[in-house]
Amino acid sequence: MGFVPMAPLLADAKKDSYAIGQFNINGLQWAKAILAGAESQQSPVIAAASDRLIDYLGGFQTVVAMMGALTDELGITVPVVLHLDHGLSIERCKKAVDAGFSSVMFDGSHYPINENIDMTKEVVAYAHAHNVSVEGEVGTVGGMEDGLMAEIKYADVEECQRFVCETNVDALAAALGSVHGKYKGEPKLGFNEMAAISASTNVPLVLHGASGIPDEQLQRAIKLGHAKININTECMIAWSDACRTTFAEQETAFEPRLLLQEGLAMVQATVEKKIKQFGAANKAAGSASLQRR
């Protein structure tokens, strides 16, 4: 079947005011749950592997081979984007492109804006030459991401405008108050800044750290141009809670397939719930003609 680039999917989502969910792969069974959830809802889906998890999953080529085989064996018909999340370097992004990923994120948000722009431009030039989409980041999303703690640094409107103009990225992750991991208290997104950035850049925005954000805020973010919403912690909590219950109720069981079954079912259920919440259900039909890698 092949993977589709992210850019045209996000353009459609932004135009029609819905968002496509990004769900992180944490192994083969998780990938099956994500794909099955998207297929059941007839929604495009972004299956992501964070750079710090690539080696755990077996490497770039292993991830591409696994996801390609699964989409074929499971008869997946909806558009699937295979995305590198939080690419750590230019070289790692290029490796993902060469391996067959259809989208990459270069995370240069920890660098000064000039360096972030220069490095992102190099990634964009290489990726676009291979029909691969690119997401960039300005500002810093707080919380824990793959073992690294980051403080929130709000994106600057003028820096975002300059970043998009000079790099030609397909999507922008602008840090606006969300955090990776669990929230302490109710999340408070910067909607005034969000509106200004959306108006000045005119590219699809990406909301990182969306697990746990109330629906009212998510819907407002979608209306203000967020066409991609990243969910990982919510799936992990659903999985771990279900697995803990299974282990407690079946103390003598030892077969992994049975012990993990309910947890994986909860991952799929969470994917389906978020797709509906984002308004992406039944949006796959208009994407059949997309060029695939």
Swiss-Prot record:
Which InterPro entries does the record match to this protein? Aldolase_TIM (IPR013785), Class_II_FBP_aldolase (IPR050246), FBA_II (IPR000771), Fruc_bis_ald_class-2 (IPR011289)
- Report a single Gene Ontology molecular function: fructose-bisphosphate aldolase activity
Q: In which pathway does it act?
A: Polyol metabolism; myo-inositol degradation into acetyl-CoA; acetyl-CoA from myo-inositol: step 6/7
CDD domains recorded for this chain? Answer: TBP_aldolase_IIB
Q: Which UniProt keywords apply?
A: Lyase, Metal-binding, Phosphoprotein, Zinc
Binding-site residues for Zn(2+), renumbered to this chain:
H86, H180, H208
User: Would I find Phosphoprotein among this entry's keywords?
Assistant: yes
Q: Which residues carry this modification: Phosphothreonine?
A: T233
Kindly identify the residues recorded as the active site. Answer: D85 (proton donor)
| Reaction catalyzed | 6-phospho-5-dehydro-2-deoxy-D-gluconate = 3-oxopropanoate + dihydroxyacetone phosphate
Which positions bind dihydroxyacetone phosphate? G181, G209, A210, S211, N230, I231, N232, T233
What EC identifiers does the entry list?
4.1.2.29
UniProt GO BP? fructose 1,6-bisphosphate metabolic process; glycolytic process
Q: Which cofactor does it need?
A: Zn(2+)
What family classification does the UniProt entry report for this protein?
Belongs to the class II fructose-bisphosphate aldolase family. IolJ subfamily.
Q: What function is annotated for this protein? A: Produces dihydroxyacetone phosphate (DHAP or glycerone phosphate) and malonic semialdehyde (MSA or 3-oxopropanoate) from 6-phospho-5-dehydro-2-deoxy-D-gluconate (DKGP).
Cited PANTHER family: D-TAGATOSE-1,6-BISPHOSPHATE ALDOLASE, D-TAGATOSE-1,6-BISPHOSPHATE ALDOLASE SUBUNIT GATY-RELATED
Q: What is this protein called?
A: 6-phospho-5-dehydro-2-deoxy-D-gluconate aldolase
